[in-house]
């Protein structure tokens, strides 16, 4: 296996304070505020010797993040200590969600089992990176709250698990419908929870795949801080195979 390490493809969204930060789930904007020491903000511009800020954010609601089964289980199962390696063979696929009218008269945009069967073919990747194509590919700076974003069918996630996909990455706020009554059927299907407690699989949401990157096989580097939490901000990176 030969990989072009000189040209990393960053799939993460930047995290910054204030308006214009990508967010979802009705969370407040990210805050980055200087610690006040002896009545003075710890900012070089204010005369301090260093910049020293506290950051308040939500991993699920502010930008690219990776989560463990702890997201839907009574136990936390920290994502920070899960992985015993950080490089995985990955496949990038582009999918145009199917418009589906609900009983309430709402139009959902659904990634189906058929979509993924066709896109993946006979190749079984360790990691699947899904780029949605739905007329609006902008991700950075978008507030997804209340927009009924596209989502995956539970059957699609169940199938991904059955063929051996370990890491699922997508450019949406969630694998599940924004308002589903708390069912989180796709999350449960991918992790087979509560039947099992799967500590090998992760879901990464709110990535951004550059337009110029073509579908195909890559090496994925999946890194995130050692947070003892069900989710952590992450920086997935693709490398082209040569």
Feature roles, as predicted:
Residues 1-242:
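Active-/binding-site microenvironments in catalytic and ligand-binding cores
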């Amino acid at each position: 296996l030969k990989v072009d390490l000189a040209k990393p493809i960053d799939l993460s969204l930047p995290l910054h304070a204030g308006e214009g930060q990508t967010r979802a789930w009705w969370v407040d904007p990210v805050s980055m505020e200087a610690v006040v020491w002896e009545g003075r903000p710890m900012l070089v511009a204010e005369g301090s010797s260093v910049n020293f800020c506290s950051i308040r954010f939500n991993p699920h609601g502010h930008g690219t993040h990776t989560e463990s089964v702890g997201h839907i289980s009574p136990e936390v199962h920290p994502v920070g200590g899960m992985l015993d390696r950080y490089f995985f063979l990955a496949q990038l696929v582009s999918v145009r969600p199917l418009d589906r009218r609900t009983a309430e008269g709402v139009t959902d945009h659904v990634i189906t089992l058929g979509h993924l069967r066709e896109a993946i073919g006979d190749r079984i990747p360790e990691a699947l990176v899904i780029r949605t194509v739905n007329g609006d590919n902008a991700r950075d700076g978008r507030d997804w709250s209340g927009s009924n974003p596209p989502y995956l069918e539970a059957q699609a996630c169940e199938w991904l698990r059955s063929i051996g996909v370990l890491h699922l990455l997508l450019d949406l706020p969630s694998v599940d419908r924004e308002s589903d009554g708390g069912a989180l059927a796709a999350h449960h299907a991918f992790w087979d929870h509560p039947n099992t407690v799967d500590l090998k699989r992760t879901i990464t949401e709110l990535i951004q795949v550059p337009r110029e990157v073509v579908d195909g096989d890559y090496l994925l580097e999946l890194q995130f801080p050692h947070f003892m939490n069900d989710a952590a901000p992450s920086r997935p990176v693709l490398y082209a195979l040569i």
